[in-house]
Amino acid sequence: NLYQFKNMIHCTVPSRPWWHFADYGCYCGRGGKGTAVDDLDRCCQVHDNCYGEAEKLGCWPYLTLYKYECSQGKLTCSGGNNKCAAAVCNCDLVAANCFAGARYIDANYNINLKERCQ
């Protein structure tokens, strides 16, 4: 669920508050359209698509609870997760790891979506 995703982000990117990823580019935050503005925004675009695939399985990605571990900045999804929990955990894990490897550009935070995300 979103609370667990926030904690995953904190695991892989402890130096930056999670909310910096909630309103970034065209895809980080609710919804998303247009062309991703950079690599970090592409992480969110992939995450959005992953949630879309989970929904096709009949899952509720924003609400699904899953089991995972964070150890020294490394995430693992637990093997005991059911189909939906495993799918959503994997979406969040991939995104959190992607965030850790992408450059954060302050100018892409809280952008004008109407102008830049056509």
Swiss-Prot record:
SUPFAM superfamilies: Phospholipase A2, PLA2 (SSF48619)
Family from the record: Belongs to the phospholipase A2 family. Group I subfamily. D49 sub-subfamily.
Protein's name according to its UniProt entry: Basic phospholipase A2 CM-II
One CC-aspect GO term: extracellular region
Source organism of the structure: Naja mossambica
EC number: 3.1.1.4
CDD domains per record: PLA2c
GO biological process, one term: arachidonate secretion
Pfam family, one: Phospholip_A2_1
Keyword terms, alphabetized: Blood coagulation cascade inhibiting toxin, Calcium, Disulfide bond, Hemostasis impairing toxin, Hydrolase, Lipid degradation, Lipid metabolism, Metal-binding, Myotoxin, Neurotoxin, Secreted, Toxin
Cofactor(s) annotated in UniProt: Ca(2+)
Example of a GO MF term: phospholipid binding
Protein task: Snake venom phospholipase A2 (PLA2) that causes myonecrosis when injected intramuscularly, causes neuromuscular blockade with a gradual contracture and a decreased sensitivity to ACh and KCl (in the chick biventer cervicis nerve-muscle preparation), abolishes twitches evoked by indirect stimulation earlier than those by direct stimulation (in the mouse phrenic nerve-diaphragm preparation), shows indirect hemolytic activity, and shows weak anticoagulant activity. PLA2 catalyzes the calcium-dependent hydrolysis of the 2-acyl groups in 3-sn-phosphoglycerides.
UniProt-annotated binding residues for Ca(2+): Y27, G29, G31, D48
Disulfide bonds: C11-C70, C26-C117, C28-C44, C43-C98, C50-C91, C59-C84, C77-C89
Catalyzed chemical reaction(s): a 1,2-diacyl-sn-glycero-3-phosphocholine + H2O = a 1-acyl-sn-glycero-3-phosphocholine + a fatty acid + H(+)
Compartment(s) where it occurs, according to its Swiss-Prot or TrEMBL record: Secreted
